[in-house]
Curated annotation (Swiss-Prot):
GO cellular component, one term: extracellular region
Glycosylation: residue positions: 91, 123
UniProt keyword list: Glycoprotein, Secreted, Self-incompatibility, Signal
Protein name as annotated: S-protein homolog 27
Family to which this protein belongs: Belongs to the plant self-incompatibility (S1) protein family.
Length: 151
């Protein structure tokens, strides 16, 4: 006959073994699951950001998050600038970008704030125009957000 203490130890052992098996299955299958050619995200869905320069001048763009500095880039009229990332588990991912025309600062704006944009778009498009920066939703392709240039 199994006493109460032995029964608890047996249940604890089986529970630990079950947990280890689940973790091993997940680790083994991790690379099998793909999303748009990327490994299955542990944190959150894959998001793509694209900024198009629709101005007749060179547009400077410098984007960052808490963890990543994407560097400064200069784009001609019609050129695209973009990157992709996974939203973090806490849904607090934030990318902000500074825009400039030569020495003129056009502004620094939150280009992707997960709490604001999580349902707005997965492929987020921003168009830099003469007066403002316009953000579009996935469907329908309508302006849902815009930032007015400082100058």
């Amino acid at each position: 006959m199994i006493n109460s203490s032995s029964k608890k130890n047996l249940i604890s052992t089986f529970s630990s073994m079950f947990t280890i098996c689940i973790v091993m299955i997940f680790v083994t299958c991790y690379e099998t699951f793909q999303q748009d050619g990327e490994p299955f995200p542990i944190r959150g869905p894959l998001t793509r950001i694209t900024v198009k320069n629709n101005n007749d001048y060179l547009l400077g763009i410098h984007c960052k998050s808490k963890d990543d500095d994407l560097g400064f880039h200069i784009h001609k009229e019609g050129e695209l600038y973009g990157w992709k990332f996974h939203v973090n588990f806490q849904n607090s991912t934030l990318y902000f970008c500074g825009f400039s025309q030569g020495q003129d600062n056009k502004g620094v704006f939150d280009i992707d704030r997960a709490e604001r944009d999580f349902y707005r778009c997965r492929n987020c498009t921003w168009n830099a125009k003469k007066d403002s920066l316009y953000g579009y939703s996935n469907l329908p392709q309508t302006v849902t957000w815009f930032f007015k240039w400082l100058k």
